[in-house]
A protein has these predicted regions:
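Nucleotidyltransferase catalytic core that binds NTPs
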Residues: 1-173
């Protein structure tokens, strides 16, 4: 793999999420990553198709189209102080938010798949031979420890393909 391709993978951070619904907490985490990893040029939100292979997730969630629309709307408004309280607070403090339409994208890849898609399978489809950086919540990391949800092969693939950036979530320690 060429040096420029390697640099490109390291300057992109992937963020898998169900977005049920997407909110400021998701965008604030992406914003925090941009501040903490200034070499990051792109945050890619990997929107779930909602068909979880997780046997413990039985909750009905809004349609993919609605979740996509909410995420797009939230991203469009995020850095505008007239539409976003975090942007207004940042502006009043003399700071400009870094997350913008120009450095974020929403992957529709999983939405085209009409079956449960394992996270490891999804990662493998775009990671190639270089590790990619991925934001994961502590809740997802906790689920990775459950063999009903993630197989040993899944974990090997995730370890091979990713540098995980762990974020606190809910009451998971």
């Amino acid at each position: 793999m060429s040096s420029s391709t390697t640099e490109s993978k390291l300057s992109t951070i992937y963020y898998p999420l169900t977005a049920n619904p997407a909110g400021h907490h998701h965008l604030l985490l992406a914003e925090s990553v941009l501040w903490n990893f200034p070499e990051t040029q792109l945050v890619v939100f990997l929107l779930s198709n909602g068909l979880h292979p997780d046997p413990l997730k039985q909750q009905q969630i809004p349609s993919a189209a609605l979740r996509l629309n909410i995420l797009q709307s939230a991203l469009n408004d995020w850095s505008d102080p007239k539409k976003s309280l975090p942007a207004k607070i940042a502006e009043d403090s003399g700071i400009h938010l870094k997350l913008r339409k120009s450095n974020s994208a929403i992957s529709h890849r999983e939405l085209a798949i009409n079956r449960p898609l394992r996270l490891a399978e999804h990662i493998k489809s775009f990671s190639g031979s270089e590790k990619v950086r991925m934001i994961v919540g502590a809740d997802l990391l906790e689920r990775m420890l459950n063999p009903q949800i993630f197989t040993d092969l899944d974990l090997v693939e995730i370890e091979r393909s990713c540098h995980l950036l762990l974020a606190p979530r809910n009451e998971v320690e």
